[in-house]
Amino acid sequence: MYLNIAYPRNGTVKQFEISDEVLRRVQLQDYRLGNEVDGAIFGSEFKGYIFRLRGGSDKDGFPMVPGVLASSRVSLLVKRGAIGFNTFRGYQGERRRKNVRGCVLASDIALVNVTISKVGDQPIEGVTDTTAPRRLGPKRASKIRKLFNLSRTEDVRKYVVRRRVVKSGKKDRLKAPKIQRLITPRVKARRAKKAKDAIAKVRASAAERREYLRLIASNRRALRQRDHSKKHTQKVHAQRAEVAAFQKK
């Protein structure tokens, strides 16, 4: 079995091979993805470490899926973006049946991914004793504020992490990322205009509705007046006919 150990604090990852003799002394069925385990079960060099199980795959490359309480392969009906069904495949709303592994460890698991939750006494070579600096800084304005502890009134553009681009035969230059979700006066003006247009649209719609209701009311009033006039005329004619018939007698 291979063990991928990641230390997000330093940004380092390294793969180790665990012998079968070590695995025979461990009941792998007692562990599942998401659990924190003692690093000593994978070897004495990891004594004192606490690992969190993040993922893995079996000997045929089928990935482990969290939440599936099984130690073998299962066939799941999954949608796009799920484990085993890439987003760029299939159609929108389509579901496919894919073979995946459960979240319970077993003896036929070939690779396990873990992260270090607690550092032990002895450093792990290439993982905890080194640091891999990030090549790129944050792009989002809120994350830049969080990184430099800035207030909402301070200008974020002054604190963008720039990197130096070196090319042979050319002058070195600094390259800065485009800040995402940056609130500028232009953005504020656009949002204010959008809100103003929305309010004007609602007011215009309300005015049109009032005019429409007024028109309906006037039409109904005119219809009632016509009906009343018609009934009155019919009543007058009926009375005149009764008077004429009475006079003939």
Swiss-Prot record:
Keywords: Cytoplasm, Nucleus, Phosphoprotein, Ribonucleoprotein, Ribosomal protein
InterPro entries from the UniProt entry: Ribosomal_eS6, Ribosomal_eS6-like, Ribosomal_eS6_CS
MF (Gene Ontology): structural constituent of ribosome
Region ranges (Disordered): 223-249
Principal location listed in the UniProt entry: cytoplasm
Superkingdom of source: Eukaryota
Residue ranges, compositional bias (Basic residues): 223-238
Coiled-coil zones: none
Localization per Swiss-Prot or TrEMBL: Cytoplasm; Nucleus, Nucleolus
GO annotations of cellular component type: cytoplasm; nucleolus; ribosome; small-subunit processome
SMART domains on file: Ribosomal_S6e
Record-level GO BP terms: ribosomal small subunit biogenesis; translation
Cysteine disulfide partners in this protein: none
Processing and modification events after translation: Ribosomal protein S6 is the major substrate of protein kinases in eukaryote ribosomes.
Assembly notes: Component of the small ribosomal subunit. Part of the small subunit (SSU) processome, composed of more than 70 proteins and the RNA chaperone small nucleolar RNA (snoRNA) U3.
Function summary: Component of the 40S small ribosomal subunit. Plays an important role in controlling cell growth and proliferation through the selective translation of particular classes of mRNA. Part of the small subunit (SSU) processome, first precursor of the small eukaryotic ribosomal subunit.
Family: Belongs to the eukaryotic ribosomal protein eS6 family.
The protein's name: Small ribosomal subunit protein eS6
Organism this protein belongs to: Leishmania infantum
Gene (UniProt): RPS6
